[in-house]
């Protein structure tokens, strides 16, 4: 079983601001969909609330201590081990956020799927530092977002695999 993390982050490791994503990058949404479709996705409650709906064609698993949350198309669990055991798609389980879950799962992950927004963005939620761990880049593609405007910036899509 492979555990992977998928994340979009700014140059200063920001992943969120006031329980939402502080950017709108359609190619990042396509990247996210491509790499999570037909997989089990595990997220924290705040991430679930910020998304606001079930992500289709995926098994949605939400990690929470709250007992009163219900949705027939979502599995709510109270521990990471239960989330992983409950995953129907064992080939690759995707951790999709938020910050607390990323912190807990970073050392267990086999792969990181990163959208790196190459600019500094204000935020209140961060991805943990990860460059101290043994990763190897197995995919990298750089694009320009908003190319024809003065607000253009680079976005790099990367897949890192843990060196074992």
Swiss-Prot record:
<comment type="function">
    <text>Key enzyme in folate metabolism. Catalyzes an essential reaction for de novo glycine and purine synthesis, and for DNA precursor synthesis.</text>
</comment>
<feature type="binding site">
    <location>
        <position position="28"/>
    </location>
    <ligand>
        <name>substrate</name>
    </ligand>
</feature>
<feature type="binding site">
    <location>
        <begin position="96"/>
        <end position="101"/>
    </location>
    <ligand>
        <name>NADP(+)</name>
    </ligand>
</feature>
<dbReference type="GO" id="GO:0046655">
    <property type="term" value="P:folic acid metabolic process"/>
</dbReference>
<feature type="binding site">
    <location>
        <begin position="44"/>
        <end position="47"/>
    </location>
    <ligand>
        <name>NADP(+)</name>
    </ligand>
</feature>
<feature type="binding site">
    <location>
        <begin position="7"/>
        <end position="8"/>
    </location>
    <ligand>
        <name>NADP(+)</name>
    </ligand>
</feature>
<dbReference type="InterPro" id="IPR001796">
    <property type="entry name" value="DHFR_dom"/>
</dbReference>
<dbReference type="GO" id="GO:0006730">
    <property type="term" value="P:one-carbon metabolic process"/>
</dbReference>
<keyword id="KW-0521">NADP</keyword>
<dbReference type="GO" id="GO:0046452">
    <property type="term" value="P:dihydrofolate metabolic process"/>
</dbReference>
<dbReference type="GO" id="GO:0005829">
    <property type="term" value="C:cytosol"/>
</dbReference>
<dbReference type="InterPro" id="IPR012259">
    <property type="entry name" value="DHFR"/>
</dbReference>
<keyword id="KW-0554">One-carbon metabolism</keyword>
<feature type="domain" description="DHFR">
    <location>
        <begin position="2"/>
        <end position="162"/>
    </location>
</feature>
<dbReference type="Pfam" id="PF00186">
    <property type="entry name" value="DHFR_1"/>
</dbReference>
<protein>
    <recommendedName>
        <fullName>Dihydrofolate reductase</fullName>
        <ecNumber>1.5.1.3</ecNumber>
    </recommendedName>
</protein>
<comment type="pathway">
    <text>Cofactor biosynthesis; tetrahydrofolate biosynthesis; 5,6,7,8-tetrahydrofolate from 7,8-dihydrofolate: step 1/1.</text>
</comment>
<feature type="binding site">
    <location>
        <position position="58"/>
    </location>
    <ligand>
        <name>substrate</name>
    </ligand>
</feature>
<dbReference type="GO" id="GO:0046654">
    <property type="term" value="P:tetrahydrofolate biosynthetic process"/>
</dbReference>
<comment type="similarity">
    <text>Belongs to the dihydrofolate reductase family.</text>
</comment>
<dbReference type="GO" id="GO:0050661">
    <property type="term" value="F:NADP binding"/>
</dbReference>
<feature type="binding site">
    <location>
        <begin position="63"/>
        <end position="66"/>
    </location>
    <ligand>
        <name>NADP(+)</name>
    </ligand>
</feature>
<feature type="binding site">
    <location>
        <begin position="6"/>
        <end position="8"/>
    </location>
    <ligand>
        <name>substrate</name>
    </ligand>
</feature>
<feature type="binding site">
    <location>
        <begin position="15"/>
        <end position="20"/>
    </location>
    <ligand>
        <name>NADP(+)</name>
    </ligand>
</feature>
<feature type="binding site">
    <location>
        <position position="115"/>
    </location>
    <ligand>
        <name>substrate</name>
    </ligand>
</feature>
<keyword id="KW-0560">Oxidoreductase</keyword>
<dbReference type="InterPro" id="IPR024072">
    <property type="entry name" value="DHFR-like_dom_sf"/>
</dbReference>
<dbReference type="InterPro" id="IPR017925">
    <property type="entry name" value="DHFR_CS"/>
</dbReference>
<dbReference type="GO" id="GO:0004146">
    <property type="term" value="F:dihydrofolate reductase activity"/>
</dbReference>
